[in-house]
């Protein structure tokens, strides 16, 4: 069973999009934590 290149490309793009969204959420939480530490 071989998948066409287009399907593989779509899977890669979806995977990268999910990683980017997760990385953005983690980065924002980390930034908020850094700001919280600076206040105290």
Curated annotation (Swiss-Prot):
It comes from Saccharomyces cerevisiae (strain ATCC 204508 / S288c). One of its GO terms (cellular component) is plasma membrane. GO terms for molecular function: enzyme regulator activity. Residues 27-40 are cytoplasmic. InterPro entries: Pmp1/Pmp2. This is Plasma membrane ATPase proteolipid 1. The chain crosses the membrane at residues 3-26. Present with 124000 molecules/cell in log phase SD medium. The gene is PMP1. Residues 1-2 form a propeptide. The keyword Transmembrane helix applies. Monomer and homodimer. Associated with the 100 kDa subunit of the plasma membrane H(+)-ATPase. It is found in: Cell membrane. The keyword Cell membrane applies. Keywords: Cell membrane, Membrane, Transmembrane, Transmembrane helix.
């Amino acid at each position: 069973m071989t998948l066409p290149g287009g399907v593989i490309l779509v899977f890669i793009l979806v995977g990268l999009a999910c990683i980017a969204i997760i990385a953005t959420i983690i980065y924002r939480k980390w930034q908020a934590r850094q700001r919280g530490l600076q206040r105290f």
